[in-house]
Amino acid sequence: MFFHAHPDDEALLTAGTMAMLAAEGHRVVLVTATAGERGLADMAPGEALGETRLKELYQSAAVLGCARVECLGYGDSGLSPKGGSAEERPDNAFMDADIEEAAKALAAILQEERADLLAIYDPAGGYGHPDHVQVHRVGRRAAEIAGTGIVLEATVNRDPLVRLLRLATRFYRFPPEFDVRTFESAYSPGEAITHRVNVRRYARRKRAAMSAHVSQASGGDSDRTLAVMLKVPGPLYRLVFGTEWYVRRDLPPGARLRHPFERWPE
């Protein structure tokens, strides 16, 4: 089972792994906490956007070979790094959800599916979105309740990312609100990563999953991250997006595993 905050998160971080496991014959289940109804798009935030993004989620899941898709029905906490003020957020914003209550809802699906593995986010929530941080908290607790044996935290090796961004600042002027230093505490350092999953064989499916999220390829005054990624040429795309990273906390930091179910020597 793969637990994400919003539709399109699955395509960015774990799509290759999901496609690989489905191709190997595993039953893959995708769960999102929200419908992403407060995301940035050319259409106004709200119920209509949420419905659109859920349709896109189902299209992405079909490409990846998912057997089941569920949404827990919490409200999208919005684009503000800290979710904005409580007055700006919906009453049922996921970042404000009772962790035990949300974890029980997720655990019920884990138990129903008899899931062997749950994929969530690292403690930083990747780049720090409050809904992503909540996915980590809720997912961890749900795995405890359900007795799920393997918990993988989807992440990115931030070491080469920070080096690349620092180099890019010499040649490219980023928007004023963009601060490379924020990535120094985002995602996970290379030494903490336990799984480096080669998903180059599934790059086309990963790209198709990204393409399914049409609403997230435009909106705002500048190029969206998803749109930029989809412009990367095929060979370079396989190189850049051909590895997916995970941290498994019950293994030694820096363990070098290449498959979610690979065993670490006792």
Model-predicted segments: where are they?
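Metal-dependent de-N-acetylase/amidase catalytic core
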Residues: 1, 84-85, 92, 96-266
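Active-site rim/loop-helix segments in enzyme catalytic domains that contact anionic ligands
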Residues: 1-114, 141, 145, 247-250
